[in-house]
Protein backbone atom coordinates (compact mmCIF):
# COMPACT_ATOMS: atom_id res chain seq x y z
CA UNK A 1 0.00 0.00 0.00
CA UNK A 2 1.37 3.41 -0.97
CA UNK A 3 0.65 6.56 0.97
CA UNK A 4 0.70 9.78 -1.03
CA UNK A 5 1.55 12.95 0.84
CA UNK A 6 0.99 16.48 -0.41
CA UNK A 7 4.23 18.17 -1.45
CA UNK A 8 4.19 20.46 1.59
CA UNK A 9 4.07 17.43 3.92
CA UNK A 10 6.90 15.47 2.30
CA UNK A 11 10.28 15.63 4.02
CA UNK A 12 13.10 17.15 1.97
CA UNK A 13 15.37 14.74 0.15
CA UNK A 14 18.40 16.34 1.78
CA UNK A 15 18.15 18.07 5.14
CA UNK A 16 20.21 21.22 5.57
CA UNK A 17 22.00 21.43 8.93
CA UNK A 18 23.93 24.68 8.75
CA UNK A 19 26.02 26.90 10.99
CA UNK A 20 27.42 30.37 10.51
CA UNK A 21 31.14 30.89 11.17
CA UNK A 22 31.35 34.54 12.18
CA UNK A 23 34.51 36.56 11.61
CA UNK A 24 33.22 39.96 12.80
CA UNK A 25 35.26 40.87 15.90
CA UNK A 26 36.57 37.28 15.81
CA UNK A 27 33.35 36.10 17.47
CA UNK A 28 33.83 32.54 16.20
CA UNK A 29 37.10 32.83 14.30
CA UNK A 30 39.92 33.83 14.15
CA UNK A 31 41.46 34.40 17.57
CA UNK A 32 45.04 34.49 16.27
CA UNK A 33 46.56 37.05 13.87
CA UNK A 34 48.81 35.85 11.07
CA UNK A 35 51.89 37.91 11.85
CA UNK A 36 54.24 34.92 11.41
CA UNK A 37 54.29 31.43 9.85
CA UNK A 38 53.34 30.05 13.25
CA UNK A 39 50.43 32.50 13.37
CA UNK A 40 49.19 31.20 10.01
CA UNK A 41 49.31 27.60 11.23
CA UNK A 42 47.51 28.50 14.46
CA UNK A 43 44.80 30.50 12.69
CA UNK A 44 44.16 27.62 10.31
CA UNK A 45 44.14 25.14 13.20
CA UNK A 46 41.46 27.21 14.95
CA UNK A 47 39.21 26.92 11.90
CA UNK A 48 39.90 23.19 11.56
CA UNK A 49 38.87 22.69 15.20
CA UNK A 50 35.53 24.43 14.55
CA UNK A 51 34.90 22.37 11.41
CA UNK A 52 35.74 19.14 13.24
CA UNK A 53 33.21 20.00 15.94
CA UNK A 54 30.54 20.79 13.35
CA UNK A 55 31.22 17.53 11.53
CA UNK A 56 31.01 15.57 14.78
CA UNK A 57 27.65 17.25 15.49
CA UNK A 58 26.38 16.11 12.07
CA UNK A 59 26.29 19.51 10.39
CA UNK A 60 26.51 19.37 6.60
CA UNK A 61 26.66 23.06 5.61
CA UNK A 62 28.98 25.87 6.69
CA UNK A 63 28.11 29.52 6.06
CA UNK A 64 31.62 30.98 6.12
CA UNK A 65 31.83 34.74 6.54
CA UNK A 66 33.47 36.02 3.38
CA UNK A 67 32.52 39.72 3.36
CA UNK A 68 31.91 41.76 6.50
CA UNK A 69 31.40 45.51 6.04
CA UNK A 70 33.24 46.71 2.99
CA UNK A 71 36.11 44.28 3.58
CA UNK A 72 36.61 40.61 2.88
CA UNK A 73 38.23 37.32 3.89
CA UNK A 74 39.47 36.27 0.46
CA UNK A 75 41.98 37.67 -2.03
CA UNK A 76 39.95 40.36 -3.77
CA UNK A 77 40.81 42.92 -6.42
CA UNK A 78 37.91 45.09 -5.22
CA UNK A 79 37.90 45.28 -1.41
CA UNK A 80 40.65 44.93 1.21
CA UNK A 81 41.27 42.07 3.61
CA UNK A 82 39.53 42.45 6.96
CA UNK A 83 41.93 43.47 9.72
CA UNK A 84 40.78 40.57 11.92
CA UNK A 85 43.16 38.32 9.97
CA UNK A 86 46.41 40.19 10.55
CA UNK A 87 45.63 43.16 12.77
CA UNK A 88 46.03 45.48 9.79
CA UNK A 89 43.46 46.64 7.22
CA UNK A 90 44.31 45.04 3.89
CA UNK A 91 47.09 42.96 5.43
CA UNK A 92 47.84 39.79 3.47
CA UNK A 93 47.35 36.83 5.84
CA UNK A 94 49.78 34.65 3.90
CA UNK A 95 47.08 32.31 2.62
CA UNK A 96 43.55 32.59 1.22
CA UNK A 97 41.06 31.98 4.08
CA UNK A 98 38.09 31.28 1.81
CA UNK A 99 40.01 28.77 -0.32
CA UNK A 100 41.27 27.09 2.86
CA UNK A 101 37.76 26.94 4.38
CA UNK A 102 36.29 25.42 1.21
CA UNK A 103 38.98 22.76 1.00
CA UNK A 104 38.62 21.80 4.67
CA UNK A 105 34.81 21.70 4.46
CA UNK A 106 34.94 19.46 1.41
CA UNK A 107 37.42 17.12 3.12
CA UNK A 108 34.73 16.58 5.75
CA UNK A 109 31.88 16.15 3.28
CA UNK A 110 30.35 19.53 4.19
CA UNK A 111 29.19 22.25 1.83
CA UNK A 112 30.81 25.67 2.12
CA UNK A 113 28.69 28.73 1.32
CA UNK A 114 30.25 32.19 1.05
CA UNK A 115 28.39 34.38 3.56
CA UNK A 116 28.44 37.98 2.33
CA UNK A 117 27.12 40.97 4.27
CA UNK A 118 25.68 43.24 1.58
CA UNK A 119 24.21 46.68 2.36
CA UNK A 120 25.90 47.89 5.64
CA UNK A 121 29.41 49.32 5.33
CA UNK A 122 30.17 49.92 8.99
CA UNK A 123 30.39 52.88 11.34
CA UNK A 124 32.46 56.00 10.79
CA UNK A 125 35.48 54.61 12.65
CA UNK A 126 35.47 51.43 10.56
CA UNK A 127 35.08 53.31 7.28
CA UNK A 128 37.86 55.72 8.25
CA UNK A 129 40.16 52.79 9.03
CA UNK A 130 39.63 51.42 5.51
CA UNK A 131 40.83 54.75 4.11
CA UNK A 132 41.11 55.01 0.34
CA UNK A 133 40.24 51.31 0.03
CA UNK A 134 36.72 51.95 1.32
CA UNK A 135 33.87 51.73 -1.17
CA UNK A 136 32.73 55.07 0.28
CA UNK A 137 35.82 56.56 -1.40
CA UNK A 138 35.83 54.48 -4.58
CA UNK A 139 32.07 54.52 -5.26
CA UNK A 140 30.81 57.53 -3.33
CA UNK A 141 27.65 57.90 -5.45
CA UNK A 142 26.20 54.59 -4.22
CA UNK A 143 26.95 55.13 -0.52
CA UNK A 144 24.70 56.77 2.08
CA UNK A 145 25.59 57.99 5.60
CA UNK A 146 22.84 57.24 8.11
CA UNK A 147 22.87 57.33 11.92
CA UNK A 148 26.68 57.42 12.20
CA UNK A 149 27.04 54.48 9.82
CA UNK A 150 27.39 54.02 6.08
CA UNK A 151 25.27 51.90 3.77
CA UNK A 152 25.09 51.07 0.11
CA UNK A 153 22.03 52.74 -1.40
CA UNK A 154 19.65 49.99 -2.57
CA UNK A 155 17.83 52.50 -4.77
CA UNK A 156 20.89 53.31 -6.89
CA UNK A 157 21.11 51.10 -10.00
CA UNK A 158 24.88 50.71 -9.63
CA UNK A 159 24.57 49.15 -6.18
CA UNK A 160 23.45 45.78 -7.52
CA UNK A 161 26.26 45.91 -10.10
CA UNK A 162 28.85 46.61 -7.41
CA UNK A 163 27.62 43.74 -5.27
CA UNK A 164 27.60 41.43 -8.29
CA UNK A 165 31.24 42.32 -9.00
CA UNK A 166 32.13 40.92 -5.57
CA UNK A 167 29.92 37.88 -6.03
CA UNK A 168 31.45 37.25 -9.44
CA UNK A 169 34.95 37.16 -7.91
CA UNK A 170 33.84 34.54 -5.42
CA UNK A 171 31.77 32.33 -7.73
CA UNK A 172 34.21 32.37 -10.64
CA UNK A 173 37.38 31.79 -8.63
CA UNK A 174 36.25 29.48 -5.82
CA UNK A 175 34.56 26.10 -5.60
CA UNK A 176 31.79 27.39 -3.34
CA UNK A 177 28.60 25.38 -2.96
CA UNK A 178 26.50 28.46 -2.28
CA UNK A 179 26.42 32.21 -1.76
CA UNK A 180 24.58 33.46 1.33
CA UNK A 181 23.47 37.11 1.52
CA UNK A 182 23.13 38.86 4.87
CA UNK A 183 21.65 42.31 5.64
CA UNK A 184 20.12 42.46 2.17
CA UNK A 185 17.68 45.06 3.43
CA UNK A 186 17.28 48.65 4.51
CA UNK A 187 18.29 49.62 8.06
CA UNK A 188 15.53 49.48 10.65
CA UNK A 189 13.20 52.49 10.96
CA UNK A 190 14.72 54.13 7.89
CA UNK A 191 12.13 56.87 7.36
CA UNK A 192 14.96 59.43 7.22
CA UNK A 193 17.32 57.26 5.19
CA UNK A 194 19.02 59.62 2.73
CA UNK A 195 17.60 58.29 -0.53
CA UNK A 196 15.21 61.13 -1.44
CA UNK A 197 17.20 62.06 -4.56
CA UNK A 198 17.24 58.52 -5.94
CA UNK A 199 13.55 58.14 -5.04
CA UNK A 200 12.65 61.24 -7.05
CA UNK A 201 14.78 60.01 -9.94
CA UNK A 202 13.76 56.35 -10.03
CA UNK A 203 10.49 56.11 -8.06
CA UNK A 204 8.24 56.21 -11.14
CA UNK A 205 5.12 57.06 -9.16
CA UNK A 206 5.43 54.31 -6.56
CA UNK A 207 5.03 55.11 -2.88
CA UNK A 208 8.30 55.10 -0.94
CA UNK A 209 7.70 51.77 0.82
CA UNK A 210 6.88 49.90 -2.39
CA UNK A 211 9.82 51.47 -4.21
CA UNK A 212 12.18 50.35 -1.44
CA UNK A 213 10.77 46.81 -1.47
CA UNK A 214 11.16 46.73 -5.24
CA UNK A 215 14.77 47.88 -4.90
CA UNK A 216 15.65 45.05 -2.53
CA UNK A 217 13.81 42.52 -4.68
CA UNK A 218 15.64 43.74 -7.78
CA UNK A 219 19.01 43.26 -6.06
CA UNK A 220 17.98 39.74 -4.96
CA UNK A 221 16.84 38.96 -8.51
CA UNK A 222 19.97 40.41 -10.13
CA UNK A 223 22.35 38.52 -7.85
CA UNK A 224 20.42 35.26 -8.19
CA UNK A 225 20.40 35.39 -11.98
CA UNK A 226 24.03 36.47 -12.02
CA UNK A 227 25.14 33.50 -9.93
CA UNK A 228 23.08 31.04 -11.99
CA UNK A 229 24.55 32.42 -15.23
CA UNK A 230 28.04 31.67 -13.90
CA UNK A 231 27.44 28.33 -12.16
CA UNK A 232 23.84 27.05 -12.13
CA UNK A 233 24.59 24.54 -9.36
CA UNK A 234 25.69 27.15 -6.81
CA UNK A 235 22.91 27.73 -4.26
CA UNK A 236 21.72 31.24 -3.47
CA UNK A 237 20.22 32.14 -0.09
CA UNK A 238 19.52 35.01 2.29
CA UNK A 239 18.89 35.39 6.02
CA UNK A 240 15.87 37.72 6.22
CA UNK A 241 14.21 39.11 9.32
CA UNK A 242 12.29 36.21 10.86
CA UNK A 243 8.87 37.88 11.08
CA UNK A 244 7.37 38.52 7.65
CA UNK A 245 4.80 41.07 8.89
CA UNK A 246 2.44 41.69 11.81
CA UNK A 247 -0.20 39.05 12.47
CA UNK A 248 -3.84 39.88 13.18
CA UNK A 249 -3.30 39.33 16.92
CA UNK A 250 0.34 40.17 17.57
CA UNK A 251 2.47 43.08 16.41
CA UNK A 252 6.11 42.59 15.50
CA UNK A 253 7.03 45.54 17.73
CA UNK A 254 8.58 47.42 14.84
CA UNK A 255 10.78 44.64 13.48
CA UNK A 256 9.41 42.70 10.54
CA UNK A 257 10.69 41.96 7.07
CA UNK A 258 7.96 43.44 4.89
CA UNK A 259 7.24 46.81 6.51
CA UNK A 260 10.33 47.65 8.54
CA UNK A 261 13.27 46.63 6.34
CA UNK A 262 11.43 46.17 3.01
CA UNK A 263 12.11 42.47 2.39
CA UNK A 264 9.32 40.76 0.44
CA UNK A 265 10.59 37.27 1.17
CA UNK A 266 7.37 35.53 0.12
CA UNK A 267 7.62 37.38 -3.18
CA UNK A 268 11.20 36.16 -3.67
CA UNK A 269 10.20 32.57 -3.02
CA UNK A 270 7.17 32.84 -5.29
CA UNK A 271 9.33 34.19 -8.09
CA UNK A 272 11.91 31.44 -7.60
CA UNK A 273 14.87 33.75 -6.98
CA UNK A 274 15.98 32.00 -3.77
CA UNK A 275 17.15 28.43 -3.32
CA UNK A 276 17.19 28.61 0.47
CA UNK A 277 16.09 31.04 3.18
CA UNK A 278 17.54 31.17 6.71
CA UNK A 279 15.08 33.38 8.66
CA UNK A 280 16.51 35.11 11.72
CA UNK A 281 14.24 33.70 14.44
CA UNK A 282 15.66 35.51 17.45
CA UNK A 283 12.45 35.47 19.46
CA UNK A 284 10.80 33.75 22.42
CA UNK A 285 7.25 33.03 23.57
CA UNK A 286 4.62 35.24 21.99
CA UNK A 287 7.37 36.99 20.08
CA UNK A 288 7.88 33.75 18.17
CA UNK A 289 5.08 31.21 18.40
CA UNK A 290 2.17 33.19 16.84
CA UNK A 291 4.39 34.19 13.92
CA UNK A 292 5.49 30.59 13.39
CA UNK A 293 1.81 29.55 13.26
CA UNK A 294 1.03 32.33 10.81
At which residue positions do the language-model features occur?
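Glycine-rich, aromatic-flanked loop segments that form ligand/cofactor-binding clefts
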Residues: 11-19, 59-70, 94-144, 180-182, ...
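Active-site-adjacent "subsite" loops/lids of carbohydrate-active enzymes
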Residues: 14-16, 22-45, 103, 113-114, ...
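The substrate-binding groove and active-site-proximal loops of carbohydrate-active enzymes
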Residues: 26-41, 79-95, 145-164, 204-216, ...
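Aromatic- and glycine-enriched glycan-recognition loops and surfaces
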Residues: 36-57, 84-108, 214-225
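Catalytic domains of carbohydrate-active enzymes, especially glycoside hydrolases
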Residues: 42-71, 173-178, 267-277
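Aromatic-lined carbohydrate-binding/catalytic grooves of carbohydrate-active enzymes
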Residues: 57-93
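Aromatic- and acidic-residue-enriched segments that line the glycan-binding/catalytic groove
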Residues: 72-87, 120-146, 183-204, 249-256
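Active-site neighborhood of glycoside hydrolase catalytic domains
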Residues: 158-294
